[in-house]
Amino acid sequence: MSQREFNKIRSKDMAMIFQDPMTSLNPYLRVSEQMAEVLMLHQGISKSKAVKEAVRLLDAVRIPDAATRVTMYPHEFSGGMRQRIMIAMSLLCQPRLLIADEPTTALDVTVQAQIMQVLADVRQDFGTAVILITHDLGIVAGFCDRTLVMYGGQIMEEGPTDNIFADPAHPYTSGLLKAVPRLDKDEATLATIAGEPPDMSHLPPGCPFSPRCAQILDNCRAQRPARETTGQRRRACHLPVKEVA
């Protein structure tokens, strides 16, 4: 795809929310200028109309007194408010797909919940599909309909979120869930996954998780498992599903 072709779908068909809103926003421009620029470029509307639309979207993501605050600079907002601005900016051209990359990074628990509620409202009110990239299993459980578990840049397991949490079908997924602290169990130490994260420049020829897998088979190191589909679930593992511990 050429850069020109990609520009046609960027913002209009899909948009992205990045991890750090402070570095994603231009510190030298007012919020109104940054948001209006997107609409003027992709929709060809006047600056005054673009600013009005920016105010409407800031109000939609629950920024108080949006008409006044749209004239402020990024440093005048808290981290949570900056993330709301990024969400509003991503909605300017009403994309069909919104990719949120760790949208709650460096936010406290209360603000995290508020941001996730805003994303849930966006999904419902705007009819936008959301791909959430995160390491937070609690957020996955509370927000996602479907989950893809990845390791070493490859999909290990995929399926409805409730099913994956209740019955993991891959040793890596099982290890992740066991490492989550539980309030209903009195455990002296947390479970961990042995070994080190993968070196992406030197992945093994077989399963990328094989160097750390506690249930490794003879062919796991040499042969990459194919993704098999069973109902609404898919997984890539040589180990039979019933033997996953």
Predicted regions and their residues:
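ABC ATPase NBD coupling module
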Residues: 1-15, 33, 41, 163-168, ...
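ABC-type ATPase nucleotide-binding domains, specifically the catalytic core motifs of the NBD
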Residues: 1-6, 29-49, 59-63, 159
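Hydrophobic anchor residue at the start of the ABC signature
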Residues: 35, 87, 111, 115
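ABC ATPase nucleotide-binding domain helical subdomain, centered on the C-loop/LSGGQ "ABC signature"
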Residues: 44, 48-63, 70-71, 166, ...
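Short catalytic/signature loops enriched in Gly
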Residues: 64-68, 158-245
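Conserved ABC ATPase signature
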Residues: 72-77, 81
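P-loop NTP-binding/switch modules centered on Walker-like glycine-rich loops
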Residues: 94-103, 107-188
